[in-house]
Amino acid sequence: MISAAIIIERTEIRLGGAERSIAELMDELQTQGIRARILAAAGTPAENIAVLCSNQPTHRIQLSVFEKALLSHLADNHYDIVHSVLPFAFADIYQPRGGSYKEAMLQNAASYTNPALAQWKRWTHFFNRRRTACLYAEQALCRPTEHTIVAALSDYVKQQFIRHYQLSENRIAVIPNGINIHRSATHENGETFRQSLCTNTALKDYPNPVLFLFAANNFRLKGLREAISSMQIVIRQHPESPAFLIVAGSDDPTRYQIQAKMQGVEKRVLFLGAQGNLGSAIAGCDATILPTWYDPCSRFILEALAANKPVITTRFNGASEQYQDGKHGFIIKRPCTVRLADAINALCDTATRQSCVEAIRHDNLKEQVSITRHVGQLRHLYDIILTQKKG
């Protein structure tokens, strides 16, 4: 049986998509016969989780401190494969769940509408010592003298490493992101969610609304400003449009509530706050929208496809590679409000929306976005690396 060390900074699933993805990855690796163990800097130890820096006083462990602890652990414990989501050149595989640090910095800055502020953000990113340390470690890992394979979650991520670091293509394996498709909410869960919305919110005054779900914890980066502006265009073009934007996430909504009111669409944008069961929200809405400025391969969009929901996102989202524009939903080159409005208008048409749903089912996108498929491809990469080691 192959043994694998999975390196991650923290283990708490509540922290976000990367931690949840690793938890699902661990479960599926073990299901497929890999003896996997998480090596974390911080978190809660468990049977298959070793926490190596629990004696450190700070919440965020310095990369160099974690590296020293890892090398000490690996000297005493053998693993066939060392698979890291952090940029350590001693790893066999580097799987950057957030894409490349350089691209993340650039696109985060690009998400600011004020050009001066965007330029300021490009400069000040380098004042973040941890982020800068990770960027330099990533650059070092990509040097021609190193051998670590980058397991990219999308072709979008692959192109980042080629463009920013001139990394050779033979050191990149594109293994599209995957999710646990068996945790999707049931139709009944979705109906309960929808009924609650239609009964307890402004939706009760509108017959047959078409609900577009936006879900994120960083509203600016994920394009909520653009989504609201696109709703203004939709309502200006079609005052009787059935479109509603349903916003889920833990970010502060204040500025976006003000924006919606200033643009005259406050009755068309509903803010729900953080959702304990996002699957029910996906199941209860008609489509999903994420006009993001940056996402290596969004779990939210994959979960929507697994639930047979049409999706709208941008080329800055690696998940856009998992479906076809105009067939399963719509792909916008960048967060353009006019194009977003066109996509919303199109999916307000029942026939168009149903055609997308049927195409998603027919093309079996649910299996395509599964963690089972993802781990199967990852296992193949493990086998290749082990063969080369024996070589």
Task: Provide a role label for each language-model segment.
Residues 274, 293:
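Aromatic "clamp/platform" in nucleotide-sugar-dependent glycosyltransferases that forms part
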Residues 151, 205-222, 228-231:
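Conserved donor-binding/catalytic core segment of Leloir-type glycosyltransferases
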Residues 156, 178:
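Carbohydrate-associated surface elements
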Residues 310-313:
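Short hydrophobic beta-strand element within catalytic cores of glycosyltransferases
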Residues 41-43, 215-219, 243-257:
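Glycosyltransferase donor-sugar binding loop
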Residues 325-326, 330-337, 345-351:
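Conserved acidic donor-binding segment of nucleotide-sugar-dependent glycosyltransferases
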Residues 121-153, 174:
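Membrane-proximal helix-turn-helix segments that form the acceptor-binding/catalytic region
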